[in-house]
Amino acid sequence: MKLLSILFIFVSSYSFCLAAPATDKVNDLPGLTFTPDFFHYSGYLRAWTDKYLHYWLTESSRAPTQDPLVLWLNGGPGCSSLDGLIEELGPFHVKDFGNSIYYNEYAWNKFANVLFLESPAGVGYSYSTNFNLTVSDDEVSLHNYMALLDFLSKFPEYKGRDFWITGESYAGVYIPTLAVRILNDKKNFPNFKGVAIGNGALNFPNNYNTMVPFYYYHALVRDDLYNDIARNCCNNNIGTCDIYSKFFDPNCRDKVINALDGTNELNMYNLYDVCYYNPTTNLKKAFIERQMRIAVGLPARKHNAATTVPLCAQTNNTHVYLNRADVRKSLHIPSSLPAWEECSDQVGKNYVVTHFNVIPEFQTMIAAGIKILVYNGDVDTACNSIMNQQFLTSLNLTVLGEQEKVNEAWHYSGQTGTAVAGFQTKFAGNVDFLTVRGSGHFVPEDKPKESQQMIFNFINNKDYSTPIQL
């Protein structure tokens, strides 16, 4: 009997060592209006000697011990991935002025274990013990990699699991630079399968090269201004013009800025967004735009006070909810930390951009044979679809299918039958480019059903038009 008792203690201890950390488990999330059929965890991962990144893991509601691990990163640089969780692809969405949590039926954790990581230190609930928040692209990729190693030590059951990295916006830099590090660590990540980048900042200068024609063909720039830029700045060919360089040409600078400021009265993250505006709403989206322009040395746009960020983006609800004392306690957030903010001005202002173009990282990923999905909402102007299509074309990959054919439609199953979700181009090297019709910068927020189907089919190697039942 004594031997059996000792054996039981040993087995129990061994099982505990292989299990998720009980101290990080979220047992009571305030405001829930449903009972989750999955476990979720919130805590900290050590990213460097003085840097600790907050994570929130939402395990799969389908088969958590078998489904893949999917990392999600928001961009900025300097914005929190909890926005991705609460406003986009996570299972918990906030309403009623931060008082209630309702279930997102299009959550990605219906088929994957989704890890939301607030990066870099200083963003959201993440922190640095020495208060130095100046980081570069390469340092962020290193810190994210080290945080993932710490995650595997906390959750050893995920070691060897199929692993995917996803995200949007400035994560177009975070993801490729992190992927290169992961590819060099087969020991800890033997089943790294691929990446999915939404509306990514893959080539900063070309984003601005493509914005003037994008605006023009959306009837936002007058013929006389467009023709003036073409004639006097672009040798009569805007299609191949390095418009970005014209920002530094005194004869063209004002013309180009006037063209790009044509959307001042619109939501540049979704040109067709219809919403009442509230000047008191948190300025996350204005922050992202400012960071993108600062990164390439452009002046910040001027916004009218009443047209900054739409209230219906739910950002204010998120901010209110995550700063509730009972919510912070449930998520195991130290009381000594300051209030949660969607985007950190301090991180943004001190951020050092070193990767203006991620072609080398893409070439490394392609050579390694992992799957790559680049997707874009087609009415986003912050990181527009033409920029990313041209970025992939610059890789000189073979287009699969009929060379002269227009991009092929992909479909989703809607309430009234099958509908066009967007268009797709497939390249040799396991590279896919998809547009999401009618979506802006935040695809899982604007088109949740389409994005869920797209990602499910991507990681399961199915045709993007395949209907899903979850």
From Swiss-Prot:
Catalytic center residues: 169, 380, 441
Record-linked PANTHER family: SERINE CARBOXYPEPTIDASE CTSA-4.1, SERINE PROTEASE FAMILY S10 SERINE CARBOXYPEPTIDASE
Record-stated family: Belongs to the peptidase S10 family.
Protein name according to UniProt: Serine carboxypeptidase ctsa-4.1
Lineage: Eukaryota, Metazoa, Ecdysozoa, Nematoda, Chromadorea
GO biological process, one term: proteolysis
EC number: 3.4.16.5
Catalytic activity: Release of a C-terminal amino acid with broad specificity
Keywords: Carboxypeptidase, Glycoprotein, Hydrolase, Protease, Signal
Keyword Ribosomal protein found: no
UniProt keyword Thylakoid present: no
SUPFAM superfamilies to which the protein is assigned, alphabetical: alpha/beta-Hydrolases
